[in-house]
Every structure is written in structure tokens, then in C-alpha cells.
Amino acid sequence: MNIAVSKPPLTIRLCGPRGFCAGVDRAIQIVVLALKAYGAPVYVRHEIVHNRYVVEGLEAKGAIFVEELHEIPAEHREQPVVFSAHGVPKSVPEDAQARNLFYLDATCPLVSKVHKQAMRHQRLGRHVVLIGHAGHPEVIGTMGQLPEGTVSLVETVEDAGVYEPVDRENLGFVTQTTLSVDDTAGVIARLQERFPAIQAPAADSICYATTNRQDAVKQAAPGCDLFIVVGAPNSSNSKRLVEVALRAGAKHSVLVQRASEIDWNEIGDIRTVGLSAGASAPEVIVDEIIEAFKARFDTTLDLAVTVEETEHFLVNRELRSIELTTDDMAFVNGNASNALPPKATAGI
């Protein structure tokens, strides 16, 4: 006689918005469209977005990822190269032109806006203070828009407290788009306290998607025994969501790339789990994690939606006449199962 074993109850607070933002969607679409328009291989400088599963899915379609342009073989110089969503220094397109490469720029339009804000400060004679994380590709790209010596990087409130500019009266700040909203507010407040004349950008540099995802996590996290963020360890916005969840009241918060990374032995007695995804994480991985919990718990989904996102960014003019198939669109939107490579080759 078979006796059914009841599963313990669990509520999953599913955040919305989560996952792909308009800039990520556009960048992935550019690579897919380039492959359809020009054929394989299409080269991509740096990971198009910080998610290995997106990268491996594009590699399966014929994309080749490189870190520098000199890695592109001479026999493939006529194939396009795509610049990642994070943006690049001015020296990169200059290098591409010198090498007679055809390039497509997939820089997020909101990152490009920060570039313009920084250049405007510099044109007006202000030394630019960039609030961001050293070594992040977006920060490297933004600093690379300006002449050497005209921009300084500040990461923390402590940095802002010891920063000493040459001219305290002619400063302007911009920020990396994927920072913690609350942390950045503290850094800005310290800079404004020390340098009352410092000029803000005309519009907030932190992007709408970063803000929206953090707001949803703040709403869902209080009282959660565990909060899971789907994202890559090199994804700035995903790591910030982990921090936001802890500050908002989650007892524990982790960053995972696949359900296979969840340590079920360490979870213990839980009743409420929060779940979100960084802006470069496909929705199909969120679904995978929900199914993993359903296999072990009697789950109830509780949606924590703060706003509906409707933003959409156009792809490059050269690609607008190319049509995507239904399968292409599923991949671009993060909903295709072929966005996920086999778990054994996930590189975790």
C-alpha cells in the first residue's frame, strides 16, 4: 500500500519586475539579428550581458566572444563585431576603425545617456566624479569617454569622505547605472555635504530597471526565511539585489545561476522564500527554480509586483528590417528552453 507523503507548505514571493530589462533585451536581439543578417560567426567583444547561459546560448547560434579586438582572426575581419551592453571606451570603436572592422554597438541607451552626461560636465569645465565599482565594464567604458585626468572614481561613502579634488568649485557627478539606489544616495549626500557646488546630472543615472527591481525586492523580502536572486556572480545589478534583500529583512539571501546551485541540505525549516532575477537573467531559470521548489514543497505563489515595465529600445538601423522567428523571440525574451545549456556544461 502506497502512503502519500505530504510536502511541507511554502510560499514563494515572486518579484515583479524581474529578469531581462529593455537594454539587455536589445543587446541580445542585436546579436541574434546580426547572425541572421550576416551569418556566423558574429564576434562579440566581452559577454554581451553578464549571464553565462545567454552567452552559451548565443555561442550555440554562432557567436564568438572575445575580450579584445585583436583576437578576431584576419580571415574573419569582414564579419561584424558587437560591443556589449555595458558600453566601451572611445578607444574601442577607434581601434575597430583602424582594423577596418564593421561593428555594431549594443551599448544600453541608458548607459549611453550617462556617457553624454559625463561629457557634458567635462565640456562645461567640471571635473567628473563617477560613482561606481572599479573594474566593472560599464565604469571602464564611462571613464573612457573622457580625457585622462578629467574623471575620478568614487565607490563608497568613505571614499567620498576623503576625496580631494583640485578644484572644489567645479565638479559634476554621474553614476554607474546598476548600483544600489540607497548606497548611491549616501555617496551623493556625502559629496554634496563636502562640495556644495557639485553639479548633478540632468536626470538620474541609475536606470529604471535597477530601481524597479530593487523596489520589488524591498517589498517582498521582509519576513522571508530565504531570498533567492537569479544572476551571475559578475552581474553588478544582481549582486545589489542580494544586498537589498538582506537590508529589507530577509533572514538569508543568496545569488544562484541555476536551481542546481541551491543547497537543499542547508535550507532547513523554511516557510517563505523570496525570488527575483537580475536584469540579465532569463525567465526560464526562474521557472526552473520554482519547479525545483514545487518538487519538494507544497508551494503557493505570491506575486510582489510594484510596477509594470513597458520600455522598449530600438535596435541598430542596419538590423531593423530583419525579422525574428517565434523561437528567436523566445530566446531574446529569456523564455526559450534552448537559452539553457545542459547543467553538466553550465560552467558553475
Curated annotation (Swiss-Prot):
UniProt keyword list: 4Fe-4S, Iron, Iron-sulfur, Isoprene biosynthesis, Metal-binding, Oxidoreductase
Cofactor binding, per record: Binds 1 [4Fe-4S] cluster per subunit.
EC code: 1.17.7.4
Pfam families recorded: LYTB (PF02401)
Catalytic activities: isopentenyl diphosphate + 2 oxidized [2Fe-2S]-[ferredoxin] + H2O = (2E)-4-hydroxy-3-methylbut-2-enyl diphosphate + 2 reduced [2Fe-2S]-[ferredoxin] + 2 H(+); dimethylallyl diphosphate + 2 oxidized [2Fe-2S]-[ferredoxin] + H2O = (2E)-4-hydroxy-3-methylbut-2-enyl diphosphate + 2 reduced [2Fe-2S]-[ferredoxin] + 2 H(+)
Positions in coiled-coil regions: none
GO biological process, one term: dimethylallyl diphosphate biosynthetic process
Active site: E138
Residues bound to [4Fe-4S] cluster: C21, C108, C207
Residues that, per the record, bind (2E)-4-hydroxy-3-methylbut-2-enyl diphosphate: H50, H86, H136, T177, S235, S236, N237, S280
Domain of life, per lineage: Bacteria
Disulfide bridges in this chain: none
Molecular function per GO: 4 iron, 4 sulfur cluster binding; 4-hydroxy-3-methylbut-2-enyl diphosphate reductase activity; metal ion binding
Family: Belongs to the IspH family.
Function as written in the Swiss-Prot or TrEMBL entry: Catalyzes the conversion of 1-hydroxy-2-methyl-2-(E)-butenyl 4-diphosphate (HMBPP) into a mixture of isopentenyl diphosphate (IPP) and dimethylallyl diphosphate (DMAPP). Acts in the terminal step of the DOXP/MEP pathway for isoprenoid precursor biosynthesis.
Matches recorded under HAMAP family: IspH (MF_00191)
UniProt name for this protein: 4-hydroxy-3-methylbut-2-enyl diphosphate reductase
Lineage of producing organism: Bacteria, Pseudomonadati, Pseudomonadota, Alphaproteobacteria, Hyphomicrobiales
